[in-house]
């Protein structure tokens, strides 16, 4: 039963990363067309947020989850949210 949930978790994480990656690419393409600087900060923020959210899941499934990975993931999410916030209020 554990293998089923590991596979399901990996599939859902892959879908999450693909959707997030597509979203980031779309924002970056918009930046290339418009040259509006806030879009770069927005795409960097979403990148950090998406990778930070999926990092603990991937390390948990690989059975190498350490509390330091969780701390790094939370720091990445904080940096991502800060970058998104900066792009909005700037």
Curated annotation (Swiss-Prot):
Cellular component GO terms, alphabetical: plasma membrane
Principal localisation: membrane
Keyword terms, alphabetized: Cell membrane, Membrane, Transmembrane, Transmembrane helix
Membrane-spanning residues: 5-27, 40-62, 67-89
Protein name per its UniProtKB record: Uncharacterized protein AF_0585
Membrane topology of the entry: Multi-pass membrane protein
Keyword match Membrane: yes
Subcellular location: Cell membrane
């Amino acid at each position: 039963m554990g293998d089923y949930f590991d596979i399901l978790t990996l599939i859902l994480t892959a879908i999450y990363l693909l959707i997030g990656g597509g979203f980031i690419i779309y924002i970056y393409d918009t930046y290339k067309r418009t040259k509006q600087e806030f879009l770069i900060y927005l795409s960097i923020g979403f990148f950090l947020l998406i990778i930070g959210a999926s990092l603990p899941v991937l390390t948990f499934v690989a059975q190498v989850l350490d509390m330091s990975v969780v701390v790094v993931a939370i720091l990445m999410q904080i940096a991502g949210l800060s970058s998104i916030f900066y792009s909005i209020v700037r």
